[in-house]
Curated annotation (Swiss-Prot):
Homology family: Belongs to the polypeptide deformylase family.
HAMAP family xref list: Pep_deformylase
Cofactor(s) needed for function: Fe(2+)
Gene Ontology BP terms: co-translational protein modification; translation
Annotated organism of origin: Bradyrhizobium sp. (strain ORS 278)
Keywords: Hydrolase, Iron, Metal-binding, Protein biosynthesis
Binding site for Fe cation: C98, H140, H144
Protein name as catalogued: Peptide deformylase
Co-factor: note: Binds 1 Fe(2+) ion.
């Protein structure tokens, strides 16, 4: 396992539409391992492969919270070629952030419940229902696979401010 660099806004790669994974290979398994290590190190609860410059339809997630003793039992989840096949009319609002848009958070409204179809690391196609933060995170990460960022759900004014801030920061950093 190794840490991978997380690409940061305004990097244009974040707007790429990721390609489907044809088969779960040792290279895909290595990518998943690296994504988990990178996500945990950041720290974050979700990561799309495109965020580590791999335009493949792979996401990793772990919504585990510390227990009363302060210990966190990890609950790693992998979704290969995920797609939302159903969503509720009911909406919910969560404050979202993104490892590719560091230290910026805004409330985003999304369907409260979704049904997702995906392939697991064993190559088995599965379907799963998700609600609450789980549903929000799945939608956020699948958006990444389609070149969509959570700031795209904000007003034009807020979105433009965020883009300006991160574009200036990238110029200062010499990118």
């Amino acid at each position: 396992m190794s840490l991978r660099e997380i690409i940061i806004l305004p990097d244009r790669q974040l707007r790429l539409v990721s390609k489907p994974v044809e088969k779960v290979t040792p290279e895909i398994r290595q990518l998943v391992d690296d994504m988990f290590q990178t996500m945990y190190d950041a720290p974050g609860i979700g990561l799309a492969a495109i965020q580590v410059a791999q335009p493949l339809r792979v996401i990793t997630m772990d919504l585990a919270k510390p227990d009363s003793g302060g210990e966190t039992k990890r609950e790693p989840r992998v979704f290969i070629n995920p797609e939302i096949i159903a969503k509720s009319d009911e909406l919910s609002v969560y404050e979202e952030g993104c490892l590719s848009i560091p230290e910026y958070y805004e409330e985003v409204e999304r369907p409260a419940r979704v049904r997702v179809r995906f392939t697991d690391l064993d190559g088995v196609v599965r379907e799963e229902d998700a609600e609450g933060l789980y549903a929000t995170c799945i939608q956020h990460e699948i958006d990444h696979l389609n070149g969509v960022l959570f700031i795209d759900y904000l007003s034009k004014l807020k979105r433009d401010r965020v883009m300006k801030k991160f574009t200036k920061a990238a110029k200062r950093a010499g990118e």
